[in-house]
């Protein structure tokens, strides 16, 4: 059984699901799905924030920033990123739509907490970036750090297009690599201080991907869920590892698996094992 470190601060009591009179569907296409609104004339005189509905909760944002404080400049970049994600979510599945009311705590704060585990890291690689968690969030936070860089590795063309737009509008120090993870790792020659992945693959597979980077000095931080203990047990069949497991500052069953050293135990490697060979 691996020891779990519990964070010092408790999750803010204000963290809760956004509720109220908004419709269940976060993207209503007809005015009559809005409670009490029968036609467009009823929108006259309403405030701009009401006309521009966002499924994300202001209360949830406040709770997230209480957990993982950032500068006003970083907050502005994150706001732009969140707005873009909400727009793209209607046509590209970037996150589970059910998590949008808790996007700031569930995704933003969950990503930002990695910075505290690698405070000296400037050069990051995020494998399987998808909707940009944690990669784009980290890039937004590192934008004012001289020499900072985040490589966003994603093989899905639509998601890579979203990532490029997110990097552009936030002016963050990140670059998008449209390729398989294995190809990126094999071709990577630049320095990597920390490599990350979130909701991507089982640990034994992730370790196979990042082994070359970790053996060059990178730290690996993987955002995992309730199955982390079972994944660690399976990973020890292929790897000699001494992981440090941290509880997520956002509460719940989230965990962060940290690795500074990876030693291969099975010559086949975990990549092949995952494919069933």
Curated annotation (Swiss-Prot):
Coiled coil regions, renumbered to chain: none
Keyword rRNA processing assigned: yes
Pfam families given in the database record: GidB
Residues reported to bind S-adenosyl-L-methionine: 128, 133, 188-189, 198
GO molecular function: rRNA (guanine-N7-)-methyltransferase activity
SUPFAM superfamilies found in the cross-reference section: S-adenosyl-L-methionine-dependent methyltransferases
Protein EC: 2.1.1.170
Highest taxon of source: Bacteria
Catalyzed reactions: guanosine(527) in 16S rRNA + S-adenosyl-L-methionine = N(7)-methylguanosine(527) in 16S rRNA + S-adenosyl-L-homocysteine
Transmembrane segments: none
Entry's Gene Ontology cellular component terms: cytosol
Gene3D superfamilies named among the record's database cross-references: Vaccinia Virus protein VP39
Subcellular locations according to the entry: Cytoplasm
Range of residues in the leader sequence: none
Keyword annotations: Cytoplasm, Methyltransferase, rRNA processing, S-adenosyl-L-methionine, Transferase
Keyword ATP-binding attached: no
InterPro entries noted in UniProt: rRNA_ssu_MeTfrase_G, SAM-dependent_MTases_sf
PANTHER family, alphabetized: S-ADENOSYL-L-METHIONINE-DEPENDENT METHYLTRANSFERASES SUPERFAMILY PROTEIN
Record family assignment: Belongs to the methyltransferase superfamily. RNA methyltransferase RsmG family.
Main function: Specifically methylates the N7 position of guanine in position 527 of 16S rRNA.
Name of this chain's protein: Ribosomal RNA small subunit methyltransferase G
